[in-house]
């Protein structure tokens, strides 16, 4: 391990007096003690850089100071991924520490990291997180936290990579999680190894307004839920899940949107609760169900219930589901889906394309089913070859019967999975036949600390 004991002239000059916004400066440090001293004196606009190397922390590196919206405090590695924090502890935000950017560190320490209630508008970016302790690695409790361009990988123990919580009787608001790489969670237990968990059961009725987008998940095998949403009013969009046991799951809560995700290999989408929109997703899997209407153990969940709430008024529209053993499936339970819609989806596979339990209240319209038994009322689909062509993903060809075949009004599906705007009569499925703009599944080059 490399040790540092020198403090540069810049830091010696810095600590002689308090920093102000007008005197914002870059301060380079070469030890953890100097880093802590610089953080303790930091003011709006200051940037503190820790030199490349490996450092062992015997106690938490406390962040108590705040920047401003226009002049955040930045605490960063000199070069992304080149300053490693080992030992028994890492960075610790104090309640009230706000407008702070934590950037570029390689975190290999014990314990965990959290942004507490009362700490707002903080950003954790370009971190390489592979902690040595158990439990949940990173917890975000503060409003308006941004967690982006990080990598979290390689664990075999129970506990989630990232969870978003908040106060005991509310959720953290407007948390944004984007362009991260989650990989290789191999916990073999039955529960408790999610990559992302957005709330707990008792948060289900609280509105979070969170966004989870442009993240890549590979070998997310720690739980059947890679992204587990247990709060209300969230958006999960434009993510790629590849070769993973974990699904996108709306486990609790209402009024969330799952849009434009690309799910490859073993993953899919499952939902419980009310008034969700599941639109413009692409599911290509040979080993699992594509989209699942979750089981209902109760008609509507109470605020602290851990049972499965039946789906009510959920719209599943303009998705493409290909190559699945069971395309769209209803789990059953005592309480069946009620007032739900399955519209304008392309379903292609060799197994039963739709399999819903008796007593389900679902409106079917405009779907295209090909290759296996449709499993829908005859008026709810057309049994025609959608004439998909593959360029890495299956898309419409110019002669597809899906072109301009959408029925009904679903304006919230107006952006296809290529992020192109639909107009006129929409094309059935996740892809609108338009020139240019073909989107690819995310790769490691698109996410994580070294991505653009």
Q: For the regions a protein language model found, what residue spans apply to each?
A:
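Positively charged n-region of N-terminal signal peptides that target proteins for export
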Residues: 1-4
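Bacterial N-terminal signal peptides
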Residues: 7-16
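Right-handed parallel beta-helix/beta-solenoid
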Residues: 12, 20-37, 52-54, 78-79, ...
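N-terminal extracellular ligand-recognition/capping segment immediately after the signal peptide
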Residues: 30-39, 44-73, 80-90, 111
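Acidic glycine-/aspartate-rich tracts in secreted/extracellular proteins
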Residues: 53-56, 79-81, 372, 406-410, ...
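Glycine- and acidic/polar-rich repeat regions and solenoidal domains
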Residues: 58-66, 78, 83-94, 108-123, ...
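Surface beta-loop-beta hairpin patches that serve as ligand-binding interfaces in beta-rich domains
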Residues: 363, 400-452
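Short catalytic/signature loops enriched in Gly
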Residues: 386-408
């Amino acid at each position: 391990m490399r040790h540092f004991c020198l403090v540069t002239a810049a830091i010696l000059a810095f600590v002689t007096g308090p920093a102000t916004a007008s005197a914002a400066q870059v301060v380079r440090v070469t030890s953890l003690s100097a880093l802590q001293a610089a953080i303790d004196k930091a003011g709006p606009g200051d940037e503190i850089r820790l030199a490349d190397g490996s450092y062992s922390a015997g106690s938490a590196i406390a962040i108590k100071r705040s920047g401003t919206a226009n002049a955040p405090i930045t605490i960063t590695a000199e070069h992304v991924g080149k300053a490693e924090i080992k030992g028994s502890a890492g960075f610790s935000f104090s309640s009230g520490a706000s407008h702070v950017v934590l950037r570029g560190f390689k975190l290999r320490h014990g314990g965990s990291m959290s942004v507490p209630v009362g700490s707002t508008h903080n950003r954790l970016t370009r971190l390489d997180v592979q902690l040595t302790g158990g439990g949940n690695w990173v917890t975000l409790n503060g409003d308006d936290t941004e967690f982006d361009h990080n990598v979290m990988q390689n664990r075999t123990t129970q506990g989630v990579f990232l969870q978003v919580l908040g106060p005991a009787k509310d959720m953290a608001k407007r948390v944004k999680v984007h362009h991260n790489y989650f990989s290789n969670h191999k916990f073999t237990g039955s529960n408790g190894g999610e990559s992302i968990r957005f709330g707990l059961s008792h948060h289900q009725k609280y509105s979070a307004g969170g966004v989870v987008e442009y993240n890549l998940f590979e070998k997310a095998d720690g739980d059947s839920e890679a992204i587990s949403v247990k709060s209300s009013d969230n958006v999960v969009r434009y993510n790629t899940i590849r070769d993973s046991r974990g699904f996108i799951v709306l486990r609790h809560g209402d009024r969330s949107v799952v849009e434009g995700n690309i799910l490859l290999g073993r993953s899919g989408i499952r939902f419980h609760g009310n008034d969700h929109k599941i639109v413009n997703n692409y599911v290509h899997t040979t080993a699992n169900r594509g989209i699942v209407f979750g089981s209902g153990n109760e008609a509507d969940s109470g605020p602290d219930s851990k049972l499965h709430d039946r789906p009510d008024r959920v719209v599943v529209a303009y998705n493409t589901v290909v190559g699945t053993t069971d395309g769209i499936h209803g789990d059953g339970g005592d309480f069946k889906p009620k007032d739900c819609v399955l519209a304008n989806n392309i379903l292609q596979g060799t197994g039963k394309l739709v399999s819903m339990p008796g007593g389900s209240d679902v409106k079917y319209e405009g779907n295209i089913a090909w290759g296996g038994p449709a499993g829908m009322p005859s008026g709810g689909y057309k049994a025609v070859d959608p004439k998909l062509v593959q360029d890495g993903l299956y898309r419409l060809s110019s002669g597809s019967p899906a072109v301009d075949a959408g029925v009904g009004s679903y304006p919230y599906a107006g952006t296809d999975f290529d992020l192109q705007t639909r107009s006129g009569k929409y094309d059935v499925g996740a892809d609108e036949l338009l020139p240019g703009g073909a989107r690819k599944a995310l790769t490691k080059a698109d996410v994580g600390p070294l991505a653009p």
